[in-house]
Structures are given as structure tokens and as C-alpha cells.
Design a protein with these regions (language model features):
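An acidic, glycine-rich, mixed-charge low-complexity segment common to nucleic-acid enzymes
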Residues: 1-215
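Compact beta-sheet-dominated globular domain cores
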Residues: 217-281
Length: 283
């Protein structure tokens, strides 16, 4: 007799559960967690969520990562390490810590609301020692990304292969370049020069490089200065080759921050400069 067929998890947060007053729940999570800036000082566009748009994106990215791990798991213990589900409830580790350095979990109960067909209903964010989790054993693990030896650190001595003209032929890439430079005749040459300058800067200041996890792969984000040295105009996503990097696409600095935040709070100055001050402080 064959075992029961595997039940696959929805990978989108709003498909997994019904969230009443989602933005207010994010406000509560921001208050629980260690203080962090969850919005940009001067956003590229006006988001619907004007208080915690970065936290919103982060939580959705974390859940998607965990749901994919759940779906790929071949053993029950590996499923439960990502997202724990049972008749009583469901939960996952948000990857964030409270102000007393306890893990923060998102907890769900079975959905019995007629307004939604989702299986789960969001109940609360809670610390790892919350009574809500007393029947959850073991607790799901904190989401972590395992990097292989070649992707643990950026190697500024490696060459960067960039086809600047090909990148700039893509309308989406071109739209991310400051408008004043988009019609610049020698833009491919300018982009090539900015990449080489970024590589040389990384030799002197390794901290300017930020890692990101994109479509299941580790990449590095390198700032590009096209119009001056006061602030980065772009970030180039570098994929890891065999002893070299491949410059595949250009991102705005704010896009780079959103991607990098899934791994950790970015510490590179060119990314930190984008942020508004945290609205709360540790008591």
C-alpha cells in the first residue's frame, strides 16, 4: 500500500493564509523585532504600505523560500523544519529576533472564515516561548541559506565579464539608469568603466559588496557610479562563474536592498544610506 500523496504548499503568502489587516500586523512585527529601518528615505515610488514596505517584501520572500524548501523536502522532518503544519495550527520562523533576542514566529490557526477560502488564518506573531507554540515540537528552524565555498566571499581579483551593449539593449535594464544618462552616446563604455572601478574599489573596501539569493542562486551586488561619487546610480548583479563573475543585469539601489535583505540586513554604506531612520528604539 502506498503512502499518502505529498501535499504541496502554496508558495505565496496570501495564497497560504488569510491575513486580516495585514499592514497593522506588519506594524506589530516591526515593534516586536530588533529596531530596523523598514522603509526607504526617498522611495522610488509610493507604495501602498508606506510604513513597512521593506518588511512586507521581506516576509513574503522568507515565506516563499520556506515553502519551496517544504515542497522539495523528501522527509517529514525536513518539511517541519521549514513550515510546521498540523490540525491545530501552522507556523514558521520569520528569521527575525525580538528585543530579548528570541526567535519570532508567524502562527496560524485553521481558517473558518467565510470571507476566505484559504486553509489557514493568521493568528499572531509570537516569540519562541509563547504559549501559542507549546504543542509545536520541534519548532521550525530559522531560515538560513547555505553557501558553498566559492560563494562565501567576493573575490575582487576575479575578472568580471560584462556585455554592456547587450545589457543596455534590454529596455528594463536601460530604464533603471538615471534618465539624464540614458541617451549618452558612450553609455556602454561608461558602464564598462564603472564595473572596473567597482571591482577595484572592492579590493580596497570589500564591505561594499552585498550578497543576494536570486532564483535559487547566490549572487553579489556591486555598486556602480555613473554620474559621480556621491551616491551609487546602479547595482550590478554578478553571478558566480568558474573563477570569474558574470555581470547579468542592472538594478536600482533600492531593488538591490530589497533583494539583499532576505539574507541579512545590508551593512554596505551605499545601501544603508537609502534608509529612513528606524521608528523605534530598544527600550
Amino acid at each position: 500500500m502506498q503512502g499518502a500523496a505529498k501535499q504541496y504548499m502554496e508558495t505565496e503568502l496570501f495564497e497560504f493564509a488569510f491575513w486580516p489587516d495585514f499592514f497593522a500586523q506588519l506594524d506589530r512585527l516591526a515593534e516586536m523585532a530588533l529596531p530596523e529601518a523598514w522603509r526607504f528615505r526617498e522611495p522610488d515610488y509610493a507604495p501602498r504600505n508606506d510604513r513597512t514596505p521593506i518588511l512586507e517584501r521581506y516576509l513574503k520572500d522568507v515565506f516563499r523560500l520556506l515553502a519551496i524548501r517544504y515542497n522539495q523536502a523528501e522527509e517529514t522532518w525536513a518539511e517541519e523544519a521549514a513550515i510546521m503544519t498540523c490540525g491545530r495550527g501552522a507556523c514558521f520562523h520569520t528569521g527575525l529576533f525580538s528585543r530579548t533576542y528570541k526567535g519570532i514566529y508567524a502562527y496560524f490557526i485553521p481558517n473558518r472564515k467565510d470571507v476566505s477560502m484559504r486553509k489557514w488564518h493568521f493568528k499572531d506573531f509570537c516569540e519562541e516561548n509563547s504559549p501559542l507554540l507549546k504543542y509545536t515540537v520541534p519548532l521550525p528552524q530559522r531560515p538560513q541559506l547555505i553557501m558553498n565555498a566559492r560563494s562565501e566571499a567576493f573575490h575582487p581579483g576575479w575578472p568580471i565579464r560584462v556585455n554592456a551593449r547587450h545589457i543596455l539593449e534590454d529596455a528594463e535594464n536601460l530604464s533603471r539608469i538615471p534618465q539624464a544618462l540614458q541617451s549618452f552616446g558612450n553609455l556602454p563604455l561608461l558602464l564598462d568603466a564603472a564595473v572596473e572601478l567597482g571591482r577595484r574599489q572592492a579590493l580596497a573596501e570589500p564591505g561594499i559588496i552585498a550578497p543576494q539569493f536570486y532564483h535559487g542562486r547566490m549572487q553579489f551586488l556591486m555598486p556602480l557610479y555613473l554620474s559621480g561619487r556621491s551616491k551609487a546610480d546602479l547595482a550590478m548583479a554578478l553571478s558566480i562563474g568558474d573563477g570569474y563573475y558574470i555581470g547579468e543585469t542592472c538594478l536600482t539601489p533600492q531593488m538591490a536592498y530589497l533583494n539583499a535583505r532576505l539574507l541579512a540586513r545590508p551593512t554596505a554604506g551605499w545601501l544603508k544610506d537609502l534608509m529612513a531612520l528606524p521608528s523605534t528604539k530598544i527600550p
